Amino acid sequence: MKRKASAVWHGDLKSGRGQISTESTVLKDTQYSFGTRFENGPGTNPEELIGAAHAGCFSMALSAELGKAGFTADRISTSATVTLDNHPQTSWTVTKIHLETTAKIPGIDAEKFAAIAAGAKAGCPISRLLAAAEITLDAKLV
């Protein structure tokens, strides 16, 4: 399986602008810039997109692991906070991703849920891709 996305950049780093698109067209010429990445300007940025991908992947991995254990979630809600730090030796680096998930799962206890969530975090393809960063998880039943 292969998925495709593209980016086009115009101009210099600080005053330039770019567009990000995905093959599915969910993103089509979506604007990004230095301001959206480093100055909290309106628009998207690569780290936000990484966070969205990780939250989505983890939620699906958790659903799969719950299914293997005989459980079906009514709802899984996950957010990902991506930390981008500027280190003198390495420049800008994604150093940490914190996943926060809440789930409503009939018949499961907190201990079993925590173990399954930890396994989903370790097995999620995006977690494995981003293994150079510290990945933390806060998983709660609701």
Predicted regions: what is each one?
Residues 1-52, 59-142:
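Extended beta-strand/beta-hairpin segments
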